[in-house]
C-alpha cells in the first residue's frame, strides 16, 4: 500500500511540473529574459510603457521611473502632428533595473492611472514569410518619431528590424522573336506633282492642255492606305481623244498631316487638297470652204 501511494504521489508531481503556467501574460517569461520570444528578440534594458496620459511628457516619465533605477533614455511616440500616441519606451542603464520594473508592473500607477508595462521586443524577419508573423487581431503597427517601426500587441512592443530577404533570381534575357515588328516612323510631306497621262489622238487633230504647276506646300491630306487605279486611254470612234480617267479609291478616313521633309513611303499615296484632274481636250470644228466655181 505504501508503494502504491508513493507511485501516485510521484505521478502527480510530474504532471504538475509539466502543466503550463495558469496565467501566461506575455510570450516572454518575466523571470527568464534570456529565453527567445515568439515574435522577436527581447531588448534586455528597455521596457514598453502604455496608457500614458496625453499631458505627460518625457521629463515626467523620467522622474517617475528614476525611483526604480537609472534611466538612460525616455521616448514617447508622437504622431506627425506632434501629439502623443499614449505610449513610449524607457531604457535603463542595466538589465536588472528593467527586470525590476517588469516584476512590479502590476503595482505601478502614475497619477492614479495604471500603466501598461511590458518587455520591449525587437521583431526579426529573416527569410520568413510576412504572413506567418502577423499577430492576432487587436495589433497596432506603429512607428517611432525616428522612423523605427514596431508592433504593439497584448501589452508587448515588438521592434521591427530591417528585413533580410532573398534576392530574386535573375531571369535569362529572352531573345527577340522572329515575328515581324512594326515600327512607326514619321511621315514627311513630299512635293506633289500632278501627272497627266498622255492622250492618244488621231493624226490631224489639235489638242490643248493646261500646263500643270507643282502643288503648293500647303498642308495636304495623308491617305493611308490608299490605292490609285490607272486606266489606259481610249480612242473615241468619232476621231476625238478621250483623256485617261484618274480614279482614287480611299479605304480609310484621311487625317491631316502638316510636317515638311522628304520621306520614301511604301504602299502609301500622297495627294494634295485639290486632286489633279485631267485637262480638258478641245477639238476644233472643221472649216467649211465654199467654192465659187
From Swiss-Prot:
Annotated localization: Cytoplasm
SMART domains hit by this protein: RRM
Biased amino acid composition, Polar residues: 1-16
DAZ domain residues: 172-196
InterPro entries assigned to the protein according to its UniProt record, in alphabetical order: DAZ_dom, Nucleotide-bd_a/b_plait_sf, RBD_domain_sf, RRM_dom
Any Pfam family: RRM_1
Molecular function (Gene Ontology), one example: translation activator activity
Domain RRM: 45-122
GO terms (BP aspect): cell differentiation; meiotic cell cycle; positive regulation of translational initiation; spermatogenesis
Biological function: Probable RNA-binding protein, which may be required during spermatogenesis. May act by binding to the 3'-UTR of mRNAs and regulating their translation.
Family: Belongs to the RRM DAZ family.
Assembly and binders: Interacts with DAZ1 and DAZL.
Protein name (database record): Protein boule-like
